[in-house]
UniProtKB/Swiss-Prot annotation:
<keyword id="KW-0235">DNA replication</keyword>
<dbReference type="GO" id="GO:1990077">
    <property type="term" value="C:primosome complex"/>
</dbReference>
<comment type="similarity">
    <text>Belongs to the PriB family.</text>
</comment>
<dbReference type="InterPro" id="IPR023646">
    <property type="entry name" value="Prisomal_replication_PriB"/>
</dbReference>
<dbReference type="InterPro" id="IPR000424">
    <property type="entry name" value="Primosome_PriB/ssb"/>
</dbReference>
<keyword id="KW-0639">Primosome</keyword>
<comment type="subunit">
    <text>Homodimer. Interacts with PriA and DnaT. Component of the replication restart primosome. Primosome assembly occurs via a 'hand-off' mechanism. PriA binds to replication forks, subsequently PriB then DnaT bind; DnaT then displaces ssDNA to generate the helicase loading substrate.</text>
</comment>
<comment type="function">
    <text>Involved in the restart of stalled replication forks, which reloads the replicative helicase on sites other than the origin of replication; the PriA-PriB pathway is the major replication restart pathway. During primosome assembly it facilitates complex formation between PriA and DnaT on DNA; stabilizes PriA on DNA. Stimulates the DNA unwinding activity of PriA helicase.</text>
</comment>
<keyword id="KW-0238">DNA-binding</keyword>
<dbReference type="GO" id="GO:0003697">
    <property type="term" value="F:single-stranded DNA binding"/>
</dbReference>
<feature type="domain" description="SSB">
    <location>
        <begin position="8"/>
        <end position="107"/>
    </location>
</feature>
<dbReference type="Pfam" id="PF22657">
    <property type="entry name" value="SSB_1"/>
</dbReference>
<dbReference type="InterPro" id="IPR012340">
    <property type="entry name" value="NA-bd_OB-fold"/>
</dbReference>
<dbReference type="GO" id="GO:0006269">
    <property type="term" value="P:DNA replication, synthesis of primer"/>
</dbReference>
<protein>
    <recommendedName>
        <fullName>Replication restart protein PriB</fullName>
    </recommendedName>
</protein>
Amino acid sequence: MLKSNLKIENRLSLIGVTESVKRSKSPNGIEHCRIWLEHRSEQQEAGLIRQARCKMPIQISGHQLIHKTQGITVGSKILVVGFITSHKQTNGLNQLVLHAEHIELLD
């Protein structure tokens, strides 16, 4: 627990533009949406401005969040808040994935 009494163990918020959107349904009927999000911003560090860029896969699962993805297409600007975890890829490498718990379409 932090001194501020906030419980923030694994939380990430990211704004970016969608590069790809793929919807699917698991064999047990759970709907999923996988988005590649590209983030670009300027951040101040040690008194200097630096370019911050990343591409991150976003995993959206379950009916409550899936309906919020209906308006999201390639090029949409969105805010995603959730937790990060590592997924093992088919090539054996691990990749960080942001699992969405909140999504907002910004444009």
